[in-house]
Amino acid sequence: MSDMELAELWVAVAFFVFVGILLYNGVHKALAKALDARGARIAAELDEARRLKEEAQKLVAEYKRKQREAEAEAEAIVTAAKAEAERLAAETKAKLEEFVSRRTRMAEDKIAQAEHQALADVKAFAADAAVQAAERILAASVPGTATGDRLLGQAIQDVRGKLN
């Protein structure tokens, strides 16, 4: 055996002795225990991460549901507001039409009253003119006697009664 082979042999022997000492002192148990603890810690972290992921998914689902509900509620509010606006517009239009109709009727009534009054004034004026004309004609045709004045007064009263 050469020196080189002898050195390799001693390194191998030293290695096996070292491993034997480690095994004898229970280092392998401590190492296994440390690895088991690390594995348990990693498993716990994975379980916690899984639990947090599920919780986050539940929260996301709940927020999406709330968002859909809020959108539906907003849409319902908009629909109700549009319906209310349409109702108010129709009500306002009806009130405006009623107001215009009432004002038109009032104007037509005033016009009819004015026409009636004008017609009555024209009739009264015509009656007075006819009476005055009749007075002049009768006064000219009948001399100024008491009977003539009486007949004239009676005729004037008859004409006034018929014309008015």
Curated annotation (Swiss-Prot):
Signal peptide per UniProt: none
Keyword annotations from UniProtKB, A to Z: ATP synthesis, Cell inner membrane, Cell membrane, CF(0), Hydrogen ion transport, Ion transport, Membrane, Transmembrane, Transmembrane helix, Transport
Recorded topology in the membrane: Single-pass membrane protein
Record's GO cellular component terms: plasma membrane; proton-transporting ATP synthase complex
InterPro entries: ATP_synth_b/b'su_bac/chlpt, ATP_synthase_B_chain
A family per Pfam: ATP-synt_B
Predominant location: membrane
Subcellular location: Cell inner membrane
Stored HAMAP family: ATP_synth_b_bprime
Function (record text): F(1)F(0) ATP synthase produces ATP from ADP in the presence of a proton or sodium gradient. F-type ATPases consist of two structural domains, F(1) containing the extramembraneous catalytic core and F(0) containing the membrane proton channel, linked together by a central stalk and a peripheral stalk. During catalysis, ATP synthesis in the catalytic domain of F(1) is coupled via a rotary mechanism of the central stalk subunits to proton translocation.
Stated name of the protein: ATP synthase subunit b 1
Organism of derivation: Azorhizobium caulinodans (strain ATCC 43989 / DSM 5975 / JCM 20966 / LMG 6465 / NBRC 14845 / NCIMB 13405 / ORS 571)
